[in-house]
Amino acid sequence: MTKRKYERGSEWRQWDLHVHSPASFHWGGVRFEPGGIDSEKNRELIDEMIAALNQAKPAVYAVMDYWTFDGWFALKKRLKEAGSPQLQKTIFAGIELRLAAPTTCRLNAHVLFSDEVPDQVLHDFKSTLEVEIIKSSLSDNALMELARTISEDILKVHGIKKADVEHDDQKALLAGAMVAEINCESYKKAIEKVPKGQAIGFMPYDTSDGLAEVKWQEHYAFFLGLFRSSPIFETRNIDRRCAFVGDETPGNAKWFKSFQSALGFPKLAVSGSDAHCFVGQSGDNDKRGYGDFPSSKITWIKADPTFLGLCQAIREPSKRSFIGAKPPKLEE
C-alpha cells in the first residue's frame, strides 16, 4: 500500500495472509458502524488497526473480510487523510467467500489482490460473483435478498427469526452472510477477469471448511478444478505443506507422487492467523490477533514484501517459503 525500497534484497520475513478487520461480519471486537470512514468511531478503529498491524511481527498482511472490501477501502481512505498514523507494513486486499460445493460444509475460499489494484476492479470482481439461489451479483442488497428468500427453518439453525430479517436490514445482512454461497464457476471467472494478474486464488485445504472436505473420489472434477487452479493453499500440516511445495518427506512419501500429479505443479502453502481481533490473548488459539499464528505455524517467505515478491514465492515455493517457528537458515 506504500512504496518502499528494499536494499537488502530478498530476506526471510513473517507474512500473515489471513486477517480480518472490523468490517468483517465475523469480528470479535468492536465492528464498524454504518457511515464508513467518515464516522469518527470508525476512524478510531482504523487507527487502532494500523497500530496493531505495525506492532505485530509480520511484514505483510492480507485483509480477508467475509463478502466485502469495506475494511480495505476504509484503511486506504484513512491513510490518505491528514493526521493519519503511518502504516509501516505491506497490506494486500483480499476477500473471504463461501462456495456452493458437494460437501456438508460451506466451502471456504479466498482471493488475494495486489495492493495496487484499483477500487473499480474490486467492485467489478464482486459483480462477477453469483450468489446461489437468487442468482444475483454479490452485494449487501443481494445478501439481504437471500436472507428474505430462504426458509424459516434455515434461519432458525442460525438463531435468526424470519420476522427480524423482514423488517431489519442489518439483521437481514447478517443472516445473508451466514448462509450465502457463491457459484464456483463464477468464482473462477471473477479471478480470471481481474487484469494484469492482480488477483490470486487462495484456497484453505485442511483448515476450517477447506477443500479437503470435498470427497475427491466422488467429486473428482469439482475437486480437481479448484486444486489445480489455486496458486496458494492454506494448511498447518507440515507434511502436506511439503507436498504442496514439491518436497517429499517420510510423512508424505506414500502419497506424494499422486498428490503432485493431481496438483499439476508445486504450489505455495501458507498458514494465516485468521485473526478476528487486533490483539489476541496469549496462549489462546481461539482469540488470535494479528500475527498470532496457531501452534507456532508461522508463515515465512523469502522475498521482498511486495506483490511481486509474493508472485516470486509462488513460482519458487520450496526455496522461498517455510511454515514453522523459524526457517533453518535463520537458526544457523
Label every model-predicted segment.
Residues 193-213:
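Aromatic-lined carbohydrate-recognition surfaces of secreted/lumenal glycan-active proteins
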Residues 53, 70-73, 161-164, 193-194:
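A broad, low-specificity signal for short, low-complexity segments enriched in glycine/proline
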